[in-house]
């Protein structure tokens, strides 16, 4: 799959590395922008308040499936029901919300886990399968929460996950049926 990641920080750079390792063709764009025209999917991995500024420097977004990995720290654009909806305003195509609840500092510790950690996502129909594949290829177990109308709930879970950190250390999360662990 051809992926353009907008944002080269801990999340964007880390996901780009995981997907390259899984065999995807990945281009990571930084503050200088760049084009998304050759991508099959665009992943937005910038601070939530920077979505508009970051995406306005990237031509070729219209019609691209997008995965929003942003968080609303320290604030969100209240003109949209979720940050994922703000991303959709730039692409006009199916969007998913994911990867905002997976700590980037743990990316290099995914593979050694006995079972893959979970990754929540909310997605529109046209983005659901692609997002599930990207989650799996990053080493996580996809945990679907429904359509894009659930994106705000995924965003708001960030506060709960931060509160669940063990002695200030980031955590993996996993949902399993009895006997799976």
Predicted regions and their residues:
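Rossmann-like NAD(P)-binding element
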Residues: 33-65, 69-74
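Active-site-lining helix/loop region of Rossmann-like oxidoreductase modules
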Residues: 119-181
């Amino acid at each position: 799959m051809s992926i353009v990641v907008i944002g080269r920080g801990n999340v964007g750079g880390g996901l780009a590395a995981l997907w390259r390792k899984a065999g995807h063709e990945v281009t990571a764009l930084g503050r200088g922008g760049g084009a998304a025209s050759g991508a099959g999917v665009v992943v937005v991995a910038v601070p939530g308040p920077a979505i508009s500024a970051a995406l306005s420097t990237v031509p070729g977004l219209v019609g691209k499936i997008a995965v929003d990995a942003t968080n609303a720290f320290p604030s969100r654009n209240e003109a949209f029901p979720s940050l994922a909806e703000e991303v959709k305003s730039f692409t006009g195509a199916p969007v998913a919300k994911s990867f905002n609840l997976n700590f980037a500092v743990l990316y290099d510790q995914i593979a050694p886990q006995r079972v893959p950690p979970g990754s929540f996502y909310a997605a529109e129909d046209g983005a659901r399968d692609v997002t599930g594949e990207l989650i799996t290829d990053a080493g996580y177990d996809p945990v679907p929460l429904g359509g894009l109308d659930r994106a705000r709930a995924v965003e708001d879970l960030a506060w709960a996950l931060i509160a669940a950190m063990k002695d200030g250390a980031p955590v993996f999360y996993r949902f399993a049926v009895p006997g799976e662990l």
